[in-house]
């Protein structure tokens, strides 16, 4: 999930949380049925602006879920219901040292209508009703036809519907998707130098344009 170009990862002799800045990545949902109800959580750490590579016994657990470690990143994919709408507390351990990251996880966004695998009439004002998840910073709705696309950047604080111009679409299979970026207003940490978030959520359904 995390792909960062730059200098080689830093190996520290002391990886106590007081030496580290934490970066939390949350990706909720996906573009197909296999990922729609999956949340990926990844946590990486840096020191003096360089990513850390762990080589000792460091561990990270979030609400009892142990995140597997790869190099300097702890990363796990879980059913979205595992964390959605709940207070999540992540405990990082390095030897006797403990640091925590806590936040309320967002619920998944949803496309309420049209329904999955339904037939949708092409028109100048094709309605898409949706629910955003959590505290959104930016999002958009997009409709894809066999050879065209239409999208909208909804306005307002919590809109629930957009109208898309799908007249240029050909008949046939397509998709409707909601892509959302979010923050976590109550995100905080104990023991670390700092904590930051990168959050994104996606929901997509298949439809047939007629």
Walk through the language-model features, giving the residues of each.
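Ser/Thr/Pro- and often Gln-rich low-complexity regulatory segments
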Residues: 1-107, 139-146, 152-155, 160-210
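Short, solvent-exposed loop/linker segments at the N-terminal edge
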Residues: 34, 117-124
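Aromatic/hydrophobic beta-strand junction motif of beta-rich domains
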Residues: 42-49, 126-134
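Proline-enriched interdomain boundary motifs that mark the N-terminal boundary
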Residues: 109-116
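Secondary-structure-rich domain cores
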Residues: 122, 126-129, 137-138, 160-162
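Extracytoplasmic/cell-surface-exposed regions of Actinobacterial cell-envelope-associated
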Residues: 126, 130, 143-148
């Amino acid at each position: 999930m995390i792909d960062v170009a730059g200098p080689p990862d830093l190996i520290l002799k002391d990886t106590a949380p007081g030496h580290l800045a934490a970066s939390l990545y949350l990706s909720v949902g996906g573009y197909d049925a296999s990922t729609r109800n999956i949340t990926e959580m990844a946590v990486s750490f840096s020191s003096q602006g360089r990513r850390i590579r762990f080589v000792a016994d460091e561990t990270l657990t979030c609400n009892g879920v142990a995140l597997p470690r790869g190099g300097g990143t702890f990363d796990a994919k879980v059913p979205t219901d595992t964390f959605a709408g709940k207070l999540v507390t992540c405990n990082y351990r390095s030897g006797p040292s403990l640091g925590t990251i806590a936040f309320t996880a967002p619920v998944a966004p949803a496309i309420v209508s049209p329904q999955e695998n339904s037939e949708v009439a092409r028109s100048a004002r094709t309605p898409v009703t949706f629910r955003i998840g959590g505290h959104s910073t930016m999002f958009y709705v997009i409709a894809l036809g066999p050879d065209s696309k239409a999208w909208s950047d909804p306005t307002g604080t919590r809109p629930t519907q957009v109208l898309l111009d799908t007249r240029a679409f050909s008949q046939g299979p397509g998709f409707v998707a909601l892509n959302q970026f979010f923050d976590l207003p109550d995100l905080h940490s104990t023991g670390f130098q700092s904590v930051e978030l990168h959050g994104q959520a996606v929901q997509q359904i298949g439809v047939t344009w007629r």
